[in-house]
């Protein structure tokens, strides 16, 4: 129940303008098709924000103060692990260059990155779910940190990947992400200190995008 209340609060705050939303409307400059999206990502210059892969829905984080206690966390299920691998394989098949990868400190986010085959991975509190175990000010700080990462241009010729959690994504981006699914990617282009959403992709769709790139 506390998690539901928090999400409802996030939506209410967004509606009242208390959360900073994407500086342009969702899909204001969408990429038109799979081939165009693959081409855009091959050129680099994007930030790919991913909610961690599929998990066991009947499990919870029982030691949320200790992200290193993997056994006490809601971890990836077999489908989540398989899709994380296919996500990384699809990016490589499509020739998408991945540079820096930032993840939550929780294992379900970090494992999504490692199974995808990413190498330059850094865990950060900025992407870690705080929920009710950190202060509202800290949750707000993390939301702002996520927005700053979205607005930061990657190293030339690469794309940055961020792997986080639903509450963090809602806090940072608002009510349009209230139904963000496990494994879903929101792809942004940093632009003049802001960020433009160009596509939202489910993890099951990446092999199709890779095929279109050929």
Give the positions of each predicted feature.
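Active-site-proximal alpha-helix that buttresses catalytic centers in soluble enzyme cores
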Residues: 30-126, 130-134, 142, 176-186, ...
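Histidine-centered catalytic micro-motifs
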Residues: 50-55, 162-169
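Bacterial N-terminal signal peptides
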Residues: 13-22
